[in-house]
Amino acid sequence: MSFAQRLRKFRFDWPQRVAAVLLLLLLVQCYWVARHQTLTERDYEYARCGREMWEKPSPLAGYFTSCGNIHDGTLAYRAAGLPLTVERIFAGASSQNSPWELRHQLTYVLLLMRLPFVFCGLCLGAALWWVTRRLFGNEGGFVALSLYCFSPEIVRACTYPNPEILATFGFFAAVYTAIGVAHAMQGPRRKWRPRIVLLTAAFGFTAAAHVLAALLAFLFALGFMVYLAERRRAALIPVMLYSAIGTLLLLFASYAFRPDAFSYVFRSGAARMWFSFAPAKTFFSAMPNAGVTLAAGIALLLFATVRRSRYFGNLAALLIALALVPIVTTGVPGEPWLWALPFLLTFVGGVFADALETPQRKVFLAATAAVLLLQAALCVASLPGLAR
């Protein structure tokens, strides 16, 4: 089926409209927070280093940018600097000038820098809805997306320059693309290639955001593909080999094909990690996240007691969430608990969708609505704190 045929088959019915409204509400929250923020030294660092990556090499010998060697991924810097570079090009200004230099007069500079991160957050929400709707139906998709769009931590991650929302999107996309590749391997070979290319792009995106996220995503993807490929397991070796080579090439490209800068990926300790439940405890005990915490607790209880909830779609998401939650990065700053959040919401959406198909549907429907309304109210109430 050609792309044009697929486009003609696309329908924007009520499920898509509800999802679009939820994503629009997330966009409104991000816009409100960004409008009430002020520019910081972190913004300046990301803007300056990002512009240098796009426009000119560092004047300092042996360094990729004037910020020094980038040890926590280039993608966030490039994302923050790209809108400023594009604006300068369209304005016809010299590369020595930028809207950043007029940041005190131009109020939209802060919004420009946050656009790529907000866009990535919206893409992650769309991917979460698409996956959960495919796996669990409309109800599972709406539960997961509602909790996502009214998660204060998602709004926070979308409204300042950082690699975490980028790594979270890449991680989620890589794992479920790998599952899709494993399913496609049961069919004709002509359907493999586009999915393998997409898988490579997802791994490359994740690696450019955070090396540890890419390594963990690769391990989970390999494990699920070995489990699902069945009679095609022998073909996994070349598939994963091509994906790994393509990922390294994309990561090399993110360093502008400069070997010295690229070598720092292997010398910076960016993939070092340890285990601690402190970040997860902070997240689940915070009042603005009470709705997510309550939903996760209910989902775990139902998963343990209701047999119909224990199948691959729910179990896979739960395993990844449980594996990521206790991980902490020791080499560079990172938030693996945030990488786990979309998988946790996928699990919640799946279990709630199963509960809504039982004879006690009305009771579960009322409980689900109460949890979602609680989380939405808490998220909106927390927005002023996020803007500070």
Predicted feature descriptions by range:
Residues 26, 144-149, 176, 203-207:
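Short helix- or helix-capping micro-motifs
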Residues 133, 174-196, 206, 352-356:
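Membrane-interface transmembrane helices that cradle and orient dolichyl/undecaprenyl
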Residues 205, 223-308, 319-331, 374-388:
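Transmembrane-lumen/periplasm boundary regions of multi-pass, lipid-linked membrane glycan transferases
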